[in-house]
């Protein structure tokens, strides 16, 4: 036994010593009886049980109750009887727990409080997720909802519901404001549109005043009806010498002048310097064909200009001034083309204008009667050229001063005077083709002829095309032979009809002289140098005066010439009244020829512009006699023009 005790002591010594810091709680029998009485009376109200016992604290009472209840349950399980029957005591249910201030997720449906809380949360979620179009209605429905559900569930539920309502209050007000802004902006836009519509209608109704005036001031102004393809109410400004696209594809005259009040304005507009940069095209196909023709002709001019560097430099310099000066009547050139650099079309236009100024001043173009052609000429080249007769109006004077330099550097060889005995084969055949077209195309083609004449011979042969003035090949070519045959046939026709006319006899003599000169293709070029030297003197005189001789023409001269220009602005159009237009064309040709012949006599004595302008007025009346005699030539022109299309 001692050994055991000694062994126990050894084991006790081996353990780590510990101290009891808290006195173990001891319940007396009296305290336990009062505890049981308080449970029957108050249940789990520990503070009241504390007051009933009087010697123990609430914490101690609760701890004692936990131990006591656990002991009772174990005893009941051992005995197999319910706790309430073993002891005459009913264990009170646990007190409901306090809801924490932070609403963390917990199981729903524990009591009525949580269900009301979930329903209020669902209401707030439905309102906040509504679309912008239904947000105001949802907000009104939320305002009508009773608040009994929200206010009866305690402090925490009230806080949550208020937060939900506040979120709803945040959204509809700015949405309402934004929608109001949108509505006001739409309303203002509609108001502006309504205010703009009468203005536009007023502009359309005032066609006879404002629209025509703007079209005269701005040459590249397109009426709104042109874009839609309706040309009936839009007057066309057809500059003299230019055949419009309308007459090529829509030959009816009533289409272009549908508005009766605008015919007089249109007729007067053709006499000004306002030109359409592009003829009106009624469809995309017409526009594509027009662009193809104009680009082909412009490329031809540019190729010849590039082969002659001096002519190209002069034409570029003149073209840089051309778009600004060609506006004519307008005080401000606010067109899109005015700010663009010189283009191919502008260079070609400047070259043509320079040649026109020279021929109008000196009359260096010996004119013969028009010959029949086999192809439709380039009548729709979009070059803003001025009027191509001798007498131009005052508006065209400023571009000529700048553009006469282009012709200086292009050799004037191919434009030799008709009075000299060594007119070359090139100029004769070129004039033959040029006279069969409008005055506009005549000037352009001879300019191209001059440039091609200065280029290489191999490139001359590549440019053989009768419709585009490529007939200036050597005299042995087939193109020139055909052209000469047609010239002889036409000369015989003119002799049959106009044998008694002195002017026509003189023209025929000139054609015979040109035909005889075809064999003298290698003649000397001394007279050409004299012409170019004289041209330099003339240009210096022009620049010193800063005015051209056309600006000194009297008003009645401009009226007579412009009346003939409006007649000759639409020749060679198929299915059109080609008889009248051809008669007018013949009249213009005779007028140019007579004026040229008379002015060449005074060429050797100096530069005399005033006599030339006055003589043209007298001799322009001579061409009226030839109107009836040229019907045969006009019919041949029309038939061959139709056959080539």
UniProtKB/Swiss-Prot annotation:
Keywords in alphabetical order, please: Biological rhythms, DNA-binding, Nucleus, Phosphoprotein, Transcription, Transcription regulation
The modified positions for Phosphoserine read 6
Biological process terms from the Gene Ontology for this record are: circadian rhythm; long-day photoperiodism, flowering; negative regulation of circadian rhythm; negative regulation of DNA-binding transcription factor activity; regulation of circadian rhythm; regulation of DNA-templated transcription; response to cold
Where does it reside? Nucleus
Changes after translation: Phosphorylated by CK2.
Asked if the keyword Cell inner membrane belongs to this entry, the reply reads no
Q: Which residues carry the record's DNA-binding region feature?
A: 46-69
Q: Which residues form the HTH myb-type domain?
A: 19-73
Any GO CC annotation of this UniProt entry: nucleus
Pfam families according to UniProt? Myb_DNA-binding
Molecular function terms, GO-annotated: DNA-binding transcription factor activity; transcription cis-regulatory region binding
User: What is this protein's tissue specificity according to the annotation?
Assistant: Expressed in leaves, roots, stems, flowers and siliques.
Segments carrying the region annotation (Disordered) are 89-127, 149-212, 410-437, 458-500
Q: Where is this chain compositionally biased, Polar residues type?
A: 110-120, 159-169, 468-478
Q: Which portions of the chain have biased composition (kind: Basic and acidic residues)?
A: 149-158, 197-207, 483-498
Assembly, in brief, is: Homodimer or heterodimer with CCA1. Interacts with CCA1 (via internal domain); independently of photoperiod. Functions probably as part of a large complex. Interacts with CKB1 and CKB3. Interacts with LNK1 and LNK2.
Extra facts:
CCA1 and LHY are only partially redundant, but they bind to the same region of the promoters.
Which NCBIfam families does the UniProt entry name for this protein? myb_SHAQKYF
- Spell out the protein name for this chain: Protein LHY
Protein encoded by which gene: LHY
